C-alpha cells in the first residue's frame, strides 16, 4: 500500500491560482489590471491587486510633512483604484483582493507575491523616460526570475 503524503503548496500546477497585478493609478497599470482580471477569470484564479504607496523623499527636502502628504495622495489614489476595481469586478464573476503597502514599488510587489504565493505577476509598462537608463519595476521583476511576469503596454 502506498502512503499518502499531506498536500503541500506546489507552484505552477493546473494553471495559476493567484495572480498579482501591480497598480499605481497610471493608464498602463489600469490596463495591466484589466488584463490580469481577464486572465484570472479564465483560469478561475484569485486576483490580488497591489498598490504600493511610495515614500516621497523630495517632500521632506521642501519641508513638507512627508507622512501627511504621502497619506493624502495615497488615500485619493486608493479610493480611485478601489472604485475602478469595483467596476470591473461587477462585470465578471471574479475573486479578488486589494492590498496596499508602503515603500518601494519593486520590494512591495515582491513582498506581496511572496506572501500570497503568486503564480504570476502582471504590471504595466513604465511610462517614465528615465526608466530606460535606471530600469523599471517591470524589468527588475523579470530579472528577479521568481515568477512569470507579464508586462502590459
Model-derived features: where do they sit?
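Structural beta-alpha unit
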Residues: 1-14, 87-121, 128
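General small-molecule cofactor/ligand-binding pocket signal
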Residues: 50, 97-101, 150
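Short secondary-structure boundary segments
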Residues: 51, 124-126, 153
